[in-house]
């Protein structure tokens, strides 16, 4: 139900994103019964993919009040129901709410697009066979922290609108902490040993080529900054 698809080439170890309105279906059926039995790890990874869709769409330079409303709806559902869907896979309400979260996030990024996190995820996934949601999880917090000077207001607003409980006034840092807490709750990795030092220069070129060609990012990243984030992820 989104405008995007990705083609993986096992010979070149590349993933190519495709975007065309013809990919958008006339109708999508969200049946939570089909999700019962989905393993906890895949539930967690795909949930983080949906979270990444929503967050990247919210901070996109193409964001609108409509797309940001869809992003907020998705993020609120994910924070509340993803831990339950992971821990209690047979919970039909949690499965339904996560299906709706994925739907809302898809509506958001179809119109507002994505960002550096997906450029990292596509290329780490293609090179090393990492699951897409896991790769998004590796890149999401580092990219948000890199972009923070340009997106602090947006993340503060997300902290407020997603009802994060804090003793102080909600801040961008509170939103980042909420994501980190979600990672801990559902077992999402924050770093990987898969990245090879000899691959970093090539990965930087591929990541920046994809992001700068396709995505309306809030803060541009140069080669040195991209390499530092890859090293951080591989620590």
Task: Give the residues covered by each predicted segment.
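A ubiquitous short alpha-helical element
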Residues: 38-40, 62-67, 141-143, 163-167, ...
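C-terminal catalytic subdomain
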Residues: 112-174, 180
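Carboxylate- and glycine-rich phosphate/diphosphate-binding segment that chelates Mg2+/Mn2+
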Residues: 3-112, 218
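Alpha-helix C-capping/helix-to-loop hinge sites
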Residues: 36-38, 57-61, 85, 105, ...
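C-terminal charged capping/lid subdomain of soluble metabolic enzymes
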Residues: 155, 162-235
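Short alpha-helical scaffolding segments that buttress acidic/His motifs in well-ordered protein cores
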Residues: 51-55, 98-106, 120, 140, ...
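Amphipathic alpha-helical interaction segments
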Residues: 69-73, 77, 97-100, 119-122, ...
